[in-house]
Every structure is written in C-alpha cells, then in structure tokens.
From Swiss-Prot:
Disulfide bridge partners, by residue number: none
EC number(s) recorded for this UniProt protein: 2.7.4.3
Notes on the domains: Consists of three domains, a large central CORE domain and two small peripheral domains, NMPbind and LID, which undergo movements during catalysis. The LID domain closes over the site of phosphoryl transfer upon ATP binding. Assembling and dissambling the active center during each catalytic cycle provides an effective means to prevent ATP hydrolysis.
Subunit structure of this chain's protein: Monomer.
Renumbered residue ranges of the record's region NMP: 33-62
Matches recorded under Pfam families: ADK
GO biological process: AMP salvage
Gene name of the encoded protein: adk
Entry-linked PROSITE patterns: ADENYLATE_KINASE
Keywords: ATP-binding, Cytoplasm, Kinase, Nucleotide biosynthesis, Nucleotide-binding, Transferase
Stated name of the protein: Adenylate kinase
InterPro entries in the record: Adenylat/UMP-CMP_kin, Adenylat_kinase_CS, P-loop_NTPase
One of the record's GO cellular component terms: cytoplasm
NCBIfam families registered for this protein in UniProt: PRK00279.2-2
Species lineage: Bacteria, Pseudomonadati, Campylobacterota, Epsilonproteobacteria, Campylobacterales
Amino acid sequence: MKNLFLIIGAPGSGKTTDAGCIAQMNQSVAHYSTGDLLRAEVAKDSELGKKIDKIISGGNLVPLEIVINTITSAIHACEKDFIIIDGYPRSVEQMTELDKVLANEYDINLSAVIEVNVSEEVAKERVLGRARGADDNEEVFYNRMKVFVEPIEEIRKFYNEKGIFHSINGERTIEEIVTDINAIIVKKIVQG
C-alpha cells in the first residue's frame, strides 16, 4: 500500500523546499513536485512538453488529464511506500478527479493533505526574490495567486470533511515548518 501525502500552498509558500527536506530526512519517503514533473516533460522538448511550457509560462493550469496521468505514473513507478506530492491539487476539478482516480486505486491511500499557509505579501516577496524562471514576475505571480486563492476554501473544506486536512504556519523558520510536516507524516508511517 502506497501512502500519499499532498502538500499545498500559495506560490512561494515553500511547499517544494519543505517536501524535499522531509524526503531527505526519511529514507522511506519519496518526493515529487507537480511543477518539477511537468518541467521535466518540458525539458524533453516533446510536443506535450511544448504544450505544457506555453501553459506554464502564462501562469495557467495544465490540463487535468495531463497532470493526473503524470502523478499516477510517478506514484506507480515509485519504489517507496510513502510519497509526498507538492503543488496538487490546485483546483476543485483536480481535487475531484484525483478523488475519483484514488477511489479505483486500491494500492494508494491518501493519508494527509497539508497546507503550508502564508500571506499574499510573504508569497509575493519570496516568489519575486527567487527569480527561478520566466514565470517569476509580478504579473504572473498575481495570476498564479488568483489561481491558488479561488478554489482554496473548497479544497480545505473537502479534505477537512475527510479528516485528513492539516494547516501549518508557513511564515516561520524552515526547521519549524519541516518539523511540523514531518510529525504528521511520521505519525502515519508509525501507524502503518
């Protein structure tokens, strides 16, 4: 049985960095960033990669079927039983589709959804300060922030009703944030 942990948060919340730290701390945990999985496809310079690149460059969401197929392929190919995926879901449609897919995946259990919560001001400061790529400018930031904010209440409610939603303060030191996220994951590992 694979145990899946989703880490969500605004652009610049630190979710990818946090998840990477946890995977380094725990040998039994694998980490995939939705963005990295999609950027890897772009790097292949395939037709699909070119399509994804155009969408990402505008700060928009990649079509649902592409993201779901990318995620489920990564989970099935993973040799580890505890998997963190950050940056997913980003819309109600993505959440609903993942729920449908997981209902038919008897070897994958969604163990927790963890939101790294930061204010828009902190998110903007972090994103514009990191200059990771062409998608890190003010106009694209506001578009990405809008894409994040619009569905977040419904996403929180959905996973809260399932009893698997956790929100942590992402405006602290990375050590404090990682400790909190790791505690949630380790608890699930120990429970089996």
